[in-house]
Amino acid sequence: MRQLTPHEARVLATLMEKARTVPDSYPLSLNTLVLGCNQKTSRDPVMDLTEAQAQAAIDTLKKQSLVFEASSSRVPRFEHNFQRGFGVSEPQAVLLGLLMLRGPQTPGELRLNSERWYKFADIASVEDALAELKARGDDSGALMVVQLARTAGMREQRWAHLLCGESLLMPYQQAGSGDAAINPETEPVSLGQAERLQQRIDALERQVAHLYKELGLSQA
């Protein structure tokens, strides 16, 4: 299957989201779909699709059998066929949908953000589904997800989808790893890191005090 464009990914993922979170309003009309695509919350990046752009994405997705038009309504309404189209399991489809909507996320973030979509038992089950996606590809053999390098200031590695290719990942990829030194003027320090630094400082102060005592010196 060919790579999706950003507009196609947003349209597809929005249909996936609304099917689970507002089933009474699903399938979606074009107007409702555009509003969902352009939400200011739970979207990364935020987009400003026009109805014409959304319709163009729908037309292409229909040709790939990833979107269908409901036939029981006077107003055209659309529904997705993602899980069958990509041949993935339900939890895998949920994770790919969230990654398309919200950008790269850690397993913990994915579990939290999936609450209204699907109930993962724990973070380990999220990690298992991601690992399965990483180990396989789509029907053309192309990779579907990638684990990004851990950046300074982050405890967990983030995951990203590859359904639109790798070029969209550039803003999220930074040089270095979580083991690199952190510059407090440019990188945020987490609470856990601050606690570990304070513990090391306290330990060093105790060692210095012990040395002064053994040498019979007094600290200024």
Swiss-Prot record:
SUPFAM superfamilies: Winged helix' DNA-binding domain. It holds the Pfam family DUF480. Disulfide bonds: none annotated. InterPro entries: DUF480, WH-like_DNA-bd_sf, WH_DNA-bd_sf. Belongs to the UPF0502 family. This is UPF0502 protein Pnap_3223.
